[in-house]
Amino acid sequence: MAWVKKQAPGDERMQSISKSIKEGALAFLVAEYRLLLVFVGIAAIALGVISMLVDTTHWIIIIAFVIGAFFSALAGNVGMRIATEANARTAEAAKTSLPNALKVSFGGGTVMGLGVAGLAVLGLSLLFFIFVKMFITGNASFYTEMTIALEALAGFSLGAESIALFARVGGGIYTKAADVGADLVGKVEAGIPEDDPRNPATIADNVGDNVGDVAGMGADLFGSYVATVLAAMVLGNYVIKDMSAAAPFTDAFNNMGPILLPLVIAGVGVLASIIGTFLVKISSNDAKEAQVQKALDTGNWAAIVLTAIASWFLIRWMLPMTMEMNFFGVEEAVVVPSRHVFYAAMIGLAVGALISMVTAYYTSLGKKPVLDIVQNSSTGAATNIIAGLAVGMKSTFLSVILFAAAIYGSYTLAGFYGVALAASAMMATTAMQLAIDAFGPIADNAGGVAEMSELEPHVRERTDILDSVGNTTAAVGKGFAIASAALTALALFAAYVTFTGIDGINIFKADVLAMLFVGGMIPVIFSALAMQSVGKAAMEMVKEVRRQFKEIPGIMEGTGTPEYAKCVDISTQAALREMIVPGLITIITPVIIGLVFGAEPLGGYMAGVCVSGVMWAIFQNNAGGAWDNAKKSFEAGVEIDGKMEYKGSDAHKAAVTGDTVGDPFKDTSGPSMNILIKLTCLVGLVIAPILGNHGAETDTGVATETTRVEASSEVIKKVSVDMEVDEQEGVAKAEVVTYVYQNENGIPEVNEKVIAGSLAEVEARLNALKADAVTFQLKKNGAFVNEEG
């Protein structure tokens, strides 16, 4: 951040405009956070009630929730502050060259990306190790105590996602109310350019870029990052439970390798992103969008490849060579080599990259989907909108096929732990992804500062090149976030099923099927409320802008000064008022369904929200992004039916109308879907102990584990081992037969198990088994070694 602040901030007028944008954004955030303090207080009381009702939910979850909410708000605030520092400096850099403008705008994005990812890793790591110190005492089974620790950590994720939802929805309503109002009256009715200082809504529009596309996005990706890592850690605990069935699990990481792995991958991803940021540069002052995009892609791919290489070594180092996992629907434990976990992680990285490519195809300048919308603009706004809707709907096909392949492939390789690791690997380069995403709004703001400061035309041309690339990277980033949300939600869903102790979700039950449909409806209603909120706020903005054009003399001539503050106030009040209902629906609905209908119907509801939410997110994000770049195509000029069309033409006005429809799609309701999906599953996970069999004498859940541990001291255990060792390869395979007697004259319960892996791993597990046995018989490569008892 210090480097960004050292750059020249421009002349006095540029600094004044930048200051107005910063003050407006800060004023909104202060008002928003003041309102959210009330929500955090009420939610903390509710979590306190849950901790009193359920033994396995500790009161510390309240503190974790508050810290998560604070960190999420801080992530958005940090992003907004750096963006408002970088906007005028980017415009000033654009006076000299395009490479300098990219360097400053991407530098601002880098600070935000590294700050958000660093906060996520720091918060998760600190709280996790504090909770491990508090709860892992050895008084109960490791799984039981770790479950309590991770349930407390879920409070951190719940706090982060809750604030992210309100920040995303509130910021989206703010920015699009201003944007739609500015476009409809300024561009379409008055015929003045975007960001023209004569437009009363132009400051509000630029403030909106920061509170929505920067602060909202920062909180959003912070929440996504935390939820993804948490889901993988929870499922890592289940892996340890499965592997402890035959013998106590031991490793060099305090018996926590599968749990710590996603956290370590996240940390390595931050380091890989730092290296990637150094590769983002261009040399030519005549570079166009393609060269800028290539520079960003180079840095992104470098971060992805470095993360993939590091993941291979981390997985080999932190996981046993083989693991036993219980798959749903399979009676016996499945032996999973650690390399399968690596393959699952690579599926996550590959699918994340492929979905980014699919999103880029449907939303980029010069690609067929965008050109189709451009051609349809020649016959008016109606055909433009029809074409945009079709593009958004068609874009779901390839994205969903890729999601499905990722889920099926990663689950087949390593169960739900594989799915969670796929999501973790995908999100590991969040710092780089966020740096790329954030540079777009900074460049957009820089263009606004240049226009309002009446700088030379070449400055705006350079910022427009960056802004155009930023529109595509923003759409790609949203597609990336949806992909991770889908995989994370599935992992959280698996954790929910295990936490509650239910066998699965049976849709042949009437209540489950009914709630499945209710869940499918929620994203539709949520989107409708968000769109309606933007429409209502935009109407207020349009009326105010028209009033000022009519009543303030000299605005169009440039001699009168618009009342910018009134437009800023309209957006602020509308956003704060309208964000409450969608947020409360998201949080309260799963609680009511869970308490009234029970665990399985709530599972049906969660499944409905996930499937429907993913479809609506892809459709809205891609349709909005395509409409936006269809409008921008006219700035350079496009050929329609043999005739060149430019800004100001009837076709361009139709494209502006389409973009105005798409704005709330891509910046308000669309991006909120991935938070809606994850937050629904997180709420279910937090209330799962109330709905499930925690503390009951059942065959599933935490109580079973505790009961078995306590019972094990009352039985007589005899163990027979037949081990084959390959000394050259350093691997071993042991067939273990365990005889458990309730008393010396009773009939034994016989259990058979195969332990395979490196020689050190197998011997460590056999030693743990030996310590728990009354009689231990070992045969190694066909010869008896010892018999103790």
Give the ranges of each region predicted by the language model.
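Hydrophobic packing and interface segments
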Residues: 1-704
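Short linear regulatory motifs and low-complexity interaction segments
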Residues: 699-789
